[in-house]
Amino acid sequence: MNIAVVGLSHRTAPVEVREKLSISDDNIPSAFNTLNTNDQIIEVSILSTCNRLEIYSFVKNSDNGVKAIKDFLCKHSGLGIDELDPHLFSYDQAEAVKHVMRVAGGLDSLVLGEGQILSQVKKMVRLGQENHSMGPILNRLLTQAVSTGKRVRSETNLGTGAVSISSAAVELAQLKLGQSEGKDELMSLEREKVSIVGAGRMSRLLIQHLQSKGCSKLKLINRTFQRAEALALDFPDVDIHCQLLDDLDESLRNSTLIFTSTAAENPIIDAARLKEVVRDETLRLIDIGVPRNISSDVKGLTGFEAHDVDDLQEVVSRNQEARQQIALEAEALVDEEGRIFLEWWASLEAVPTINLLRSSLESVRKEELQKALSRMGPDFSARERKVVEALSKGIINKILHTPVTNLRAPQTSSNRKISLEVIETLFELGVSESE
């Protein structure tokens, strides 16, 4: 049995591939159900974000477990294994453990040190527990990954000043505005006519960053008016005009900058729609949705400038170099947490022997206690019987403490195996026969 992770990310696959594997919140239970019924998979959890889809698992056999997960991904995405496999990565054992620690710490993110991934890993843990897909191994691994992410942010400066996907999108808009004026600098968005499509968490972050860059007025477009208004009320210093998605064409005609961030599974803006829009100036569209909210056929369309999450790399690379040294400190924390987990996992090898040893000594204790109590006669009170029984239990616990502690202590697999064999032989435990 082993720990394995299979997935893809912005490092291995373009957005047009990632969006085909994205699993929406509505489809998560169905995905868990499919994976849970596979006889190769013992425990499983799913991490699905705009930049990655990763499936963490505890499997009977690494090769068979990885194949089962790849088969699921092919069926889910509609891609053949020959199309999908070049974009997938898979790790097992220590590599899988280190990977999830790095992910939670923000070290594998498009934006180094970004904080949103930690919330997404927490959500992965919650969803795995709610869908009864995680057992003791993944529970321990993923909760420790969350702790690692918190340590990285509290014990290093990696999270300080880190940009997020939303802030990178705003900076990309500033950069492209500057480039359109022949300047390689971030321009103020104060005079831009801004619209945001979507009223979720990413849109909230967009408004925060736009406000900090001089934007004091914008349109917020959503499928439901109520959710848009609720978000607008949280920003009293920004003049936010709410509209329904049905009125999107009006914003396509009158805005100069539109951000899209909805959970729609299909594009809401495509070339056919934009060709019907009459404009006097270029409309800049920045899509941070996965699956994409803006169709790929918009790129290259005259009068429109479209960008997706993969284009954020242009902004991110401007901020990364100064953070690399801090990242080395975070990597050291990740290595430390990885070792702690692997030592715990290795110690589980001793559990069957420890349980049999405890059971064997407990049988002896009960037998000898019964003999002693029978010799005490009827004059021996119930209180005195409880004292003697507690004494016998205390003796057993004292005897077990040192060997159990030593068996669970960090050591090489070969040394632990020798210790287990010695105890099994001396106490005639017969572990191999019982398994």
Curated annotation (Swiss-Prot):
Descriptive protein name: Glutamyl-tRNA reductase
Upper taxonomic lineage: Bacteria, Bacillati, Cyanobacteriota, Cyanophyceae, Synechococcales
HAMAP family: Glu_tRNA_reductase
Coiled coil: none
Quaternary structure and partners: Homodimer.
Catalytic-site annotation from UniProt: C50 (nucleophile)
Pfam families with a match to the protein in the record: GlutR_dimer, GlutR_N, Shikimate_DH
The encoding gene: hemA
Additional note from the record: During catalysis, the active site Cys acts as a nucleophile attacking the alpha-carbonyl group of tRNA-bound glutamate with the formation of a thioester intermediate between enzyme and glutamate, and the concomitant release of tRNA(Glu). The thioester intermediate is finally reduced by direct hydride transfer from NADPH, to form the product GSA.
